[in-house]
Regions:
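Short, solvent-exposed loop/turn segments at conserved positions within beta-propeller repeat blades
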Residues: 6-12, 58-60
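Beta-propeller blade signature
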Residues: 12-21
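Structural recognition of the beta-propeller blade-terminating site
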Residues: 19, 64-67, 103-105
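Conserved blade-ending motifs and adjacent loop-strand segments that build the rim/top face
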Residues: 27-42, 72-89
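Short coil/turn segments that connect the beta-strands within blades of beta-propeller domains
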Residues: 49-51, 89-90
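Loop/turn residues immediately N-terminal
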Residues: 51, 59-62, 97-101
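Blade-level signature of beta-propeller repeat domains, shared across WD40, Kelch, NHL, RCC1
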Residues: 91-117
């Protein structure tokens, strides 16, 4: 997950992957998605069972799901201050800095460090 603080008109790669003995390779997101993410991915999670990668950006309040094999964008969802992401049985659980977690509001504030228990 990359966090770019340069000009908003730049469109840097925000998600990369690698394997032992293989150089880093970057996912090519659509320009519009990179813009909506605010050139910033604060958290990333892998759902191995479903073959998905989830990314969250609190900057513009967006989280997205990518195909784990080819990096293709599957979906985007708006969530103000989207910050935490963890795999769930079918996709991802996502939290916000404001205490939003899935469809509930919590008096506890969340950051990007969440795990499924």
């Amino acid at each position: 997950a990359c966090q770019y603080e340069g000009p908003r008109t730049d469109r840097p790669p925000l998600v990369g992957h690698f394997a032992k003995g293989v150089p880093v390779s970057y996912v090519q997101l659509p320009d519009e998605t990179t813009d909506r993410l605010g050139n910033y991915v604060g958290a990333i999670a892998v759902n191995r069972g479903q073959g998905l990668v989830g990314i969250a950006s609190p900057k513009n309040g967006l989280w997205a799901v990518l195909d784990g094999k080819d990096g293709r964008l599957i979906s985007e969802t708006v969530l103000a201050d989207a910050s935490g992401i963890a795999p769930s049985p079918k996709s991802f659980a996502v939290s916000s800095y404001r205490g939003d977690f899935l469809d509930r509001q919590s008096p506890v504030a969340w950051d990007q460090h969440i795990i499924r228990i």
